[in-house]
């Protein structure tokens, strides 16, 4: 059941808690899933964002994304990698969440996994396209200029996109979706208590 808290205090408190958890999950665990691209790491910071999406609403999930991104920038800044990688991550997460909200506006009507196939495929596909486009036009040129890491020269664009970016984001999107749905199901009792 989609839940909107009855008070502003509840809403603000939950957004703060989810943002803090999401920030923590940006730092640990970080899992490389493509052997040839260990610099591309999966994290689970999306899960609290999805909780905010379905416990509260879309705008709440955007607040969680914004706050955890600012926390990362302020408290765990790694220099150039953060300045260049964080915007890419932000846009990919926004794409995933937006498509998820459009294709699966509430959980009540998508109670079984068969009904979740379209949202899974759609959100994963769109976030992958966004990741490819942002990497191509923004991240790669900026990394070459500011981090002295020319991907086209050291890895090759074909190898980078087909062998790294494409499979990484497809796997990441599937894992994000499946883990988020499992967690949402597991914490349903907390959801009811939060609303009571």
UniProtKB/Swiss-Prot annotation:
<comment type="function">
    <text>Probable riboflavin-binding protein that interacts with the energy-coupling factor (ECF) ABC-transporter complex. Unlike classic ABC transporters this ECF transporter provides the energy necessary to transport a number of different substrates. The substrates themselves are bound by transmembrane, not extracytoplasmic soluble proteins and transport it into cells.</text>
</comment>
<feature type="transmembrane region" description="Helical">
    <location>
        <begin position="120"/>
        <end position="140"/>
    </location>
</feature>
<dbReference type="InterPro" id="IPR025720">
    <property type="entry name" value="RibU"/>
</dbReference>
<keyword id="KW-1003">Cell membrane</keyword>
<feature type="transmembrane region" description="Helical">
    <location>
        <begin position="80"/>
        <end position="100"/>
    </location>
</feature>
<dbReference type="GO" id="GO:0032217">
    <property type="term" value="F:riboflavin transmembrane transporter activity"/>
</dbReference>
<keyword id="KW-0812">Transmembrane</keyword>
<dbReference type="GO" id="GO:0005886">
    <property type="term" value="C:plasma membrane"/>
</dbReference>
<keyword id="KW-1133">Transmembrane helix</keyword>
<comment type="subunit">
    <text>In E.coli forms a stable energy-coupling factor (ECF) transporter complex probably composed of a membrane-embedded substrate-binding protein (S component), 2 ATP-binding proteins (A components) and 2 transmembrane proteins (T component). May be able to interact with more than 1 S component at a time.</text>
</comment>
<dbReference type="Pfam" id="PF12822">
    <property type="entry name" value="ECF_trnsprt"/>
</dbReference>
<feature type="transmembrane region" description="Helical">
    <location>
        <begin position="14"/>
        <end position="34"/>
    </location>
</feature>
<keyword id="KW-0813">Transport</keyword>
<keyword id="KW-0472">Membrane</keyword>
<feature type="transmembrane region" description="Helical">
    <location>
        <begin position="46"/>
        <end position="66"/>
    </location>
</feature>
<feature type="transmembrane region" description="Helical">
    <location>
        <begin position="164"/>
        <end position="184"/>
    </location>
</feature>
<dbReference type="InterPro" id="IPR024529">
    <property type="entry name" value="ECF_trnsprt_substrate-spec"/>
</dbReference>
<comment type="similarity">
    <text>Belongs to the prokaryotic riboflavin transporter (P-RFT) (TC 2.A.87) family.</text>
</comment>
<protein>
    <recommendedName>
        <fullName>Riboflavin transporter RibU</fullName>
    </recommendedName>
</protein>
